[in-house]
Amino acid sequence: MTDSNLDKTLVLIPARMASTRLPGKPLADICGLPMIVQVAKRAREAAIGRIVVAVDHDDTYAAVANAGFDVVMTGMDHQSGSDRIHEALRAVDPDGRAEIIVNVQGDLPTIDPETIRASLRPLENPAVDIATLTVEIKDEEEKTLPSVVKVVGSAISESRLRALYFTRATAPYGKGPLYHHIGLYTYRRAALERFVSLGPSPLEKRESLEQLRALEAGMRIDVEIVDTIPLGVDTAADLEKARRILSGASR
């Protein structure tokens, strides 16, 4: 990636302290570092642009700043991570230099930097508004779990889909692969601005999936198929698993 592209790409990592299942989640210790710092390190290893962490608590702000990463304070009342990163974007880039905004969830401490880089590829097509990621489901149980969001899409190539729908149901019906959505989004700046200006859509509210707001508004989402799915830390058990993974990686 050229220096020019690095200047035009901004990685924003939202961190919310008020997790119901794992209170104080961004500061949970993983191998001697707060989880949010581990995520920021993975983003730095991806080397795609400036990294800013968007926080809502003084303790998180201090932890991120002490680790040497850029950080911005945001409000506590955001309904989604997209709303939080939009506030952060306006604060850290008011002049509009950044053209591509990468939203890396703050609870993915084991994410492969190459997975982050992969999210940029669909935006090489100027017709695409938003890019995201998916992995083929191999576990039969996952195919019916509502917690595993499925991508329904038309194949553009062996490694990419054009999203038609996202659902917690088992879809599409019939023989063929099913795809597990990875909640990392890369936006064109104008697409993010438009997205947050729209109110929650009917299907978004029904499925509790904010990306449906974009599809209902006629925005194009392309989905890059990757090989591995990062561990999302939502529970104490997830946290222990993340510690084991990163402990093994550091040896």
UniProtKB/Swiss-Prot annotation:
Spans traversing the lipid bilayer: none
Annotated metabolic or biological route of this protein: Nucleotide-sugar biosynthesis; CMP-3-deoxy-D-manno-octulosonate biosynthesis; CMP-3-deoxy-D-manno-octulosonate from 3-deoxy-D-manno-octulosonate and CTP: step 1/1; Bacterial outer membrane biogenesis; lipopolysaccharide biosynthesis
EC number assigned by the record: 2.7.7.38
A Pfam family the protein falls into: CTP_transf_3
Cellular component GO terms, alphabetical: cytosol
Signal sequence region: none
Localization per record: Cytoplasm
Class of the enzyme per the UniProt entry, highest EC level: transferase
Entries under HAMAP family matching the protein: KdsB
Name assigned to this protein: 3-deoxy-manno-octulosonate cytidylyltransferase
Gene: kdsB
